[in-house]
């Protein structure tokens, strides 16, 4: 009856996805970028040619002229074992992408799946979507598309080095990571590792789209350092009205570090987005700069946030076996700026057991024109324990009738506050919503061990909208 929980986390993103653009190169041509989406799950599509990431598409109207396309690479073997050999052939530039052309030779008797590729350009982690099955006993050419505009966000004007790692998976389910291979680019400006000056590299048309709110060096009071991994600098930027956080890590350990960034708070308010649990692999003895998309300014207004004063997030460090080594937190703050989140004019619909909740109203403010209307819910947890807030079957009634909603489950720690949205499944309505005079919504609130604390029901009513009252 309920939809997948992941859809709830994307509700806010889907609501205002007006920044999406068509895939570049969709008009065809030998050098055009393929228009199909990358394969995410094992299927027959694993045999299709892989495609570039869409991460740069939202910025494609801005110029990449400040980026030098002079850098090239020589042919080199990146990995060679008794199963597969992977070689780099050349580096070319197509549209707004730097394209690394490679050849893979599957020397085994089984098909091999290559995926989860890590690419560092000038020590900066560049997202590349790639998943492809290479047939047994055959050699095949393939390409990796690296968005130039994503590199420019890091302050890269020219490629000087490429470090690349592949994940190889066999039909038996066994998988392994290759050693990190290094490619030096010819005709490139020398660059000191870790010498990042984000603001100095942006020029031309893209400067109009990027505003640097803060370039902040972390100190011991709010930085993160554990097991040889340290967060050494950060920047909060806006690109095309969308906020991003840039984080620079240094891994001084002898082993790779698996880093998970999550539980993001803006202006001390817990928010959720599609990168609520973003995972990155930081290699030994390397710097790495990563980019985490947050929200558009318009989306933040739905959270009553007009200006960002600070961003806080958790960092979890694990080993290669997913065993947790340590947890910590860090923040990006803008000195002198005060966040403007304020729900003081609202009243609590429920305030017991240390949990204060309100379903943001009034009813007439709900957007009935939206395909799946959203009901904002504000929660403050003063219970002294971590709680989960979940939906259940028939937890939502509108005008006295049960209505399906996108299922949700939220985690909220003690002394934190959160605003999320319940997405109404309009397809489950018997008739189109033209007026709402009553909303009744219930929640299951449990502790971190799964024990039920309470099951509050909250009602919003507007009798003036009822056809009985109107008559």
Regions found by a protein language model. Give the residues of each.
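Surface-exposed beta-loop interaction hotspot
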Residues: 178-220, 322-361
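Asparagine-centered strand-capping/turn motif at beta-strand->loop junctions
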Residues: 104-108, 249-253, 379-384
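Low-complexity, acidic Ser/Thr/Pro/Gly-rich terminal tails and inter-domain linkers that flank the onset
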Residues: 65-94, 207-239, 339-368
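Short, solvent-exposed loop/turn segments enriched in Ser/Thr/Gly
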Residues: 95-101, 240-246, 369-376
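Short, solvent-exposed, Trp/other aromatic-anchored flexible loops in extracytoplasmic proteins
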Residues: 124-190, 270-325, 401-448
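Short acidic, flexible loop segments centered on an aromatic residue
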Residues: 109-125, 254-270, 384-401
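C-terminal motif of bacterial Sec signal peptides marking the signal peptidase cleavage site
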Residues: 17-20
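Short, low-complexity, disordered segments immediately C-terminal to signal peptides
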Residues: 22-61
């Amino acid at each position: 009856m309920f939809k997948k929980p992941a859809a709830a986390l994307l509700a806010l993103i889907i609501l205002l996805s007006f920044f999406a653009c068509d895939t570049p190169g969709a008009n065809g041509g030998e050098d055009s970028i393929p228009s199909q989406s990358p394969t995410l799950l094992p299927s027959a599509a694993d045999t299709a040619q892989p495609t570039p990431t869409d991460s740069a598409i939202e910025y494609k109207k801005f110029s990449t002229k400040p980026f030098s396309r002079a850098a090239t690479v020589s042919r080199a073997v990146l990995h060679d074992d008794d199963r597969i050999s992977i070689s780099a052939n050349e580096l070319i530039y197509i549209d707004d992408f730097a394209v690394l052309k490679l050849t893979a030779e599957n020397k085994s008797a089984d098909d091999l799946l290559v995926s989860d590729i890590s690419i560092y350009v000038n020590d900066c982690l560049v997202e590349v979507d790639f998943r492809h099955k290479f047939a047994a006993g055959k050699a095949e050419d393939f390409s990796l598309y690296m968005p130039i505009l994503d590199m420019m966000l890091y302050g890269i004007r020219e490629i000087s080095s490429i470090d690349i790692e592949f994940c190889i998976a066999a039909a038996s389910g066994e998988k392994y990571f290759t050693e990190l291979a290094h490619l030096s680019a010819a005709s490139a400006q020398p660059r000191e590792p870790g010498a990042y000056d984000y603001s100095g590299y942006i020029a031309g048309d893209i400067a109009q789209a990027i505003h640097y709110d803060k370039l902040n060096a972390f100190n011991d009071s709010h930085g993160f350092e554990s097991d040889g991994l340290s967060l050494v600098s950060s920047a909060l930027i806006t690109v095309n009205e969308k906020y991003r956080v840039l984080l620079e890590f240094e891994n001084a350990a002898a082993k790779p570090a698996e880093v998970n960034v999550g539980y993001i708070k803006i202006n001390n308010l817990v928010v959720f987005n599609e990168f609520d649990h973003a995972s990155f692999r930081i290699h030994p003895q390397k710097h790495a700069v990563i980019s985490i998309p947050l929200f558009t300014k318009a989306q933040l207004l739905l959270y009553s946030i007009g200006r960002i004063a600070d961003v806080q997030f958790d960092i979890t460090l694990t080993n290669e076996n997913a065993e947790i080594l340590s947890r910590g937190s860090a923040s990006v703050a803008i000195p002198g700026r005060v966040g403007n989140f304020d729900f003081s004019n609202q009243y609590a619909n429920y305030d017991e057991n240390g949990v204060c909740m309100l379903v943001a109203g009034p009813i007439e403010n709900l957007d009935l024109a939206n395909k799946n209307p959203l009901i904002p819910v504000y929660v403050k947890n003063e219970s002294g324990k971590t709680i989960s807030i979940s939906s259940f079957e028939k937890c939502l009634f509108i005008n006295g009738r049960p209505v399906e909603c996108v299922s949700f489950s939220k985690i909220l720690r003690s002394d934190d506050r959160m605003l999320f949205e319940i997405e109404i499944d309009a397809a489950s309505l018997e008739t189109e919503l033209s007026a709402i005079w009553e909303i009744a919504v219930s929640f299951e609130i449990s502790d971190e061990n799964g024990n039920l604390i309470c099951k509050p029901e909250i009602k919003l009513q507007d009798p003036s909208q009822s056809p009985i009252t109107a008559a």
